[in-house]
Amino acid sequence: MRQLLPGDTVWRNIRLATMDPQRQAPYGLVDNQALIVREGHICDIVPETQLPVSGDNIHDMQGRLVTPGLIDCHTHLVFAGNRAAEWEQRLNGASYQHISAQGGGINATVSATRACAEETLYLLARERMMRLASEGVTLLEIKSGYGLELATEEKLLRVAAKLASENAIDISPTLLAAHATPAEYRDDPDGYITLVCETMIPQLWQKGLFDAVDLFCESVGFNVAQSERVLQTAKALGIPVKGHVEQLSLLGGAQLVSRYQGLSADHIEYLDEAGVAAMRDGGTVGVLLPGAFYFLRETQRPPVELLRRYQVPVAVASDFNPGTSPFCSLHLAMNMACVQFGLTPEEAWAGVTRHAARALGRQATHGQLRAGYRADFVVWDAEQPVEIVYEPGRNPLYQRVYRGQIS
């Protein structure tokens, strides 16, 4: 009989989808095991016959499925306002250029966010965060990017820090100051990039407000030369980088980000084979964002087969934002990744667990059920992991465990 220490907690009578690639079964499935949690981490996974059947800290899950906590590795969670009216305009035939000329588009969100009080932004973001937590998310990336000026970018990152301080969910904050050119720099995007590189990145990094730097390398964002200035600045300070790349056109952004050993290249609908090879060589994760693909009614799909052939890890994320992916649901993103992009359900699960952890640099502690990893996991009223992907309108979450505590 296995000896338990005071304070140990056990989940028994479970079906474990460990998402551990070292296990041969699909999803890393293993039956008739028990999970021992000690001080917020998984202490061990052992045959349940080695443990007592009952006790003060022994939870009998009656055969339910247990998976790692979900990880949403790409969100724009902190913003004010919404863009529902301009979505209706687009459906009625208005062009993006027409909407932008009326003050719509990303600058509408920037204006609303700049004007919004920090406490209000926090309350808005907290409600969104708890929606994701209710789906089993235990680690969440939050980008800035709706300030496009030092004061508001800092405000957004402070909100992310306040959310993290609640200890309800892990937050990985990302500085996305190079998201778009603000209206006041419309005729001087290079000048804005200078502000980002010489002021925003160093000052906000010194304050410890973010973990990584992101950028939007695209025909409607920043060109390759401007994007490289951002990457050079970040890497000179030892800051991990990532990028929104190849969403609407092929500019070579994935190759650029991979050359700087980027954590991830996100969107990647127009990614080519050279970009895929560069991602493999740079250790860069491909992050698929099917919500934006759906909402923008795009037709160019990411090269999933090439990513498989080159063995590039593929993550899946919600991309929750008010303009192009207003879907605060990782379950829905998993389903869309399968239906629209051709991922298998097992690939979708890897995309919101171990590959999403790698996209955030957390692969040594998150995204799998293994001894030594964080005790972040979800108990589901389900028999198979595919059920969560198959029916995104139903949430079979039974219990969410964060840092070893039922939450």
UniProtKB/Swiss-Prot annotation:
Give the signal sequence positions: none
Q: What class of enzyme is it?
A: hydrolase
Residues spanning the membrane:
none
Q: Which residues bind Fe(3+)?
A: 74, 76, 244, 319
Which Pfam families is this protein grouped with? Amidohydro_1
Amino-acid positions noted as binding 4-imidazolone-5-propanoate in the UniProt annotation, renumbered to this chain: 83, 146, 179, 247, 324
Where along this sequence does the record place binding of N-formimidoyl-L-glutamate? 146, 321, 323
What's the cofactor?
Zn(2+); Fe(3+)
Give GO terms for biological process. L-histidine catabolic process to glutamate and formamide; L-histidine catabolic process to glutamate and formate
Query: What Enzyme Commission number(s) apply to this enzyme?
Result: 3.5.2.7
Lineage, top-rank taxon, reads Bacteria
- Keyword field contains Membrane: no
Mention any one GO cellular component term assigned to this protein in its UniProt record: cytoplasm
Family recorded in the similarity comment: Belongs to the metallo-dependent hydrolases superfamily. HutI family.
What is this protein's name?
Imidazolonepropionase
Instruction: Provide the species name.
Output: Salmonella paratyphi B (strain ATCC BAA-1250 / SPB7)
Q: Which gene encodes it?
A: hutI
